[in-house]
UniProtKB/Swiss-Prot annotation:
Keyword Protein biosynthesis: no
Active site positions: R89, E92, S115
N-terminal signal peptide: none
Lineage: Archaea, Thermoproteota, Thermoprotei, Sulfolobales, Sulfolobaceae
UniProt protein name: Cyanate hydratase
Alphabetized UniProt keyword annotations: Lyase
One of the GO biological process terms: cyanate metabolic process
Gene: cynS
Gene3D superfamilies membership: Cyanate lyase, C-terminal domain (3.30.1160.10), lambda repressor-like DNA-binding domains (1.10.260.40)
Length: 148
């Protein structure tokens, strides 16, 4: 059986060949475009139905299904420091604005953290003053620190 890394390479190649967008794949799966990307990148575990749909949509061999059903190994895929400019800017945003976001969040919610397990991530495009802008939303469950 192939691993998630090989599965990602095969899946992304097929996506490019078929000229599919993440939006199209997400709609086909009944999921958000970011979650669809997570499935093809191997960052999320597909359900039986999702695996079947991906295999059909991308014309993949049925033998790849078990790899989609495997639980992913969630280790950082990026070097530190990040070398990709886009990903570096995401890190930069957290490094620069993290203390401020944390302070505002604690004022709103109290002492805790936002779950990155129970989270939904959305990427959207808006036009503001005739310029495209990216809207990045992390919608995560708030987890309070325990008291004992």
């Amino acid at each position: 059986m192939i691993d998630k890394k090989e599965l990602r390479e095969i899946s992304l190649k097929k996506k490019r060949e078929k000229r599919l967008t993440w939006e199209e794949i997400g709609k086909y799966l009944g999921r958000d475009k970011v979650y669809a990307a997570m499935l093809l990148y191997g960052y999320a575990q597909a359900t039986e139905e999702e695996a079947d749909k991906i295999i059909t949509l991308l014309d993949l061999p049925k033998e790849l299904k078990p790899a989609f059903l495997d639980a992913p190994m969630r280790t950082p895929a990026q070097p530190w420091p990040p070398t990709d400019p886009f990903i570096y800017r995401l890190y930069e945003g957290v490094l620069l604005y993290g203390p401020v976001i944390k302070d505002v969040a604690h004022e709103l919610f109290g002492d805790g953290i936002m779950s990155m397990i129970d989270v939904k991530i959305y990427v959207d495009k808006v036009i503001e003053n005739n310029y495209p802008r990216m809207v990045l939303t992390f919608n995560g469950k708030w987890l309070y620190y325990s008291k004992w």
